[in-house]
Amino acid sequence: MEFRLKELRKKRKISQLKLALDLNMNQNTISRYENMERQADYTTLIKFADYFDVSLDYLLGRTER
């Protein structure tokens, strides 16, 4: 499964630090999610989807929209 967090963040020119601060997370945690070293729980996935205004299916690489 493709996780589009890094793609979305880079497209919008947002640093890991800014994303972490905006979502009240640690930058290291964002890095681990992006590198698939850690899996985000459902609540965190919703935060990412809401932040980037995309569906969970898109965020998880299940759809192209």
Description of each model-found segment:
Residues I14-R32:
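Short alpha-helical DNA-recognition segment
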Residues T43-Y58:
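DNA major-groove recognition helix of helix-turn-helix/homeodomain DNA-binding modules
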Residues K10, L21, D50:
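Alpha-helical residues within the helix-turn-helix
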Residues M1-K11:
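A short, Lys/Arg-rich alpha-helix, primarily the initiator
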Residues K11-R12, L60-R65:
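Short, charged recognition helix plus adjacent turn
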